[in-house]
Amino acid sequence: MRTVHDDELKKILKIMSPGTSLREGLDNILRAKTGGLIVLGDNEEILDLVDGGFNINSEYSPAYIYELAKMDGALVLTSDRKRILYANAQLMPNQSISTFETGTRHRTAQRVAKQTNKIAIAISQRRNIITVYKGDIKYVLRDSAVILSKANQAIQTLEKYVAVLERVTNNLNILEFQDLATLFDVTTAIQRTEMVMRIVEEIEGYIIELGNEGRLISMQLNELVRSIEQDGVLLIRDYCYDKMEYNDVYKEIQELSAEDLLDLDIIAKELGYVGKSLIDTLVSPRGYRISSKIPRIPSNVIENLVGHFGKLKYILEAGNEELDQVEGIGEARARAIKNGLRRIREQVALNKNL
């Protein structure tokens, strides 16, 4: 499970991504070049800041806020964005709240957002941009064409990184079946997996911001990454030191800086190998990752299998009778495991992706 970064910002972007009725209204105001100030919130704290204006209390529609924004004052919408409460209102936030904005709308929006921790949107009349504030967050919404271009570039980069990861993983697969994997091979595979996942995170941010215009990017992303994260977690589980919790190790690796991620010794240290030579240290996998590739074998059976034998090499050496002794594995399943591992070994020998 990936650590969630910028979760609050992602929630904000989801609310006003292309395809939503709020974004349609914002774009209408932007095209009309009238400018506007919109606050999303209907609690007492917001309503206490409202001075004057018209109490509309009408159902929200993009056309309504486009027309109402022609007046100078602010619009106040309910938090669920279903109703327009006030139009042409003057907002009176605490003037002592610091702001580095210059325009009146933007200064008011930032102060309201900081004071109430609600979303305030300022639409610039001259610069033709939409700026969103909430608490200490400030974000300028970008044009969909710009984001789409960045997302396509990121997809191309991801394709190259996935190709490298596949080569590294194929090499590790061969070595695992021969029980010749070194710490260097393992840390390289973990490093490459994390690099891929960081690009995936970036693309997911673009997809949220693109809204319904990001469907094709989303499909391309799903096609490229498939089970990469799951394989990466199982890889850590295969090789981390016995008393270490693999999910904690995964979180630590996610927290590494871009510079630290390039240092394989640091990744080895996170796995519990301190002061070991990467190239000279042979390591044996427990077998979670390879066993997960066997068709129609439930995860609880894989847990029992690895728990019983301890290492992949012992699972590979085991006969049907030995496999049959494991809880949850009968005669039929023992044959399925043996045949599954044999087919995986053949695929690996042919240098095919699992």
From Swiss-Prot:
Q: What is its EC number?
A: 2.7.7.85
Name one process (GO BP) from the record.
DNA repair
Q: Where does ATP bind?
A: 73, 91, 104-108
Per its record, the protein catalyses: 2 ATP = 3',3'-c-di-AMP + 2 diphosphate
Q: Ranges for the DAC domain?
A: 6-144
> Which cofactors does this gene product need?
Mg(2+)
Instruction: Provide the top EC class.
Output: transferase
Q: Which InterPro entries match?
A: DisA, DisA_sf, DNA_integrity_DisA_N_sf, DNA_integrity_scan_DisA_link, DNA_integrity_scan_DisA_N, DNA_integrity_scanning_protein, RuvA_2-like
Which molecular function term from Gene Ontology is one that the record holds?
A: adenylate cyclase activity
**Keywords from the named record:** ATP-binding, DNA damage, DNA repair, DNA-binding, Magnesium, Nucleotide-binding, Nucleotidyltransferase, Transferase
Q: Which domain of life is it from?
A: Bacteria
Q: Pfam families given for it?
A: DAC, DisA-linker
Its subunit composition reads: Homooctamer.
What the protein does comes down to: Participates in a DNA-damage check-point that is active prior to asymmetric division when DNA is damaged. DisA forms globular foci that rapidly scan along the chromosomes during sporulation, searching for lesions. When a lesion is present, DisA pauses at the lesion site. This triggers a cellular response that culminates in a temporary block in sporulation initiation.
Q: Which family does it belong to?
A: Belongs to the DisA family.
For this protein, the record's NCBIfam families field holds: PRK13482.1 (NF010009)
- Provide the protein name: DNA integrity scanning protein DisA
User: Which organism is this entry from?
Assistant: Clostridium perfringens (strain SM101 / Type A)
Organism classification: Bacteria, Bacillati, Bacillota, Clostridia, Eubacteriales
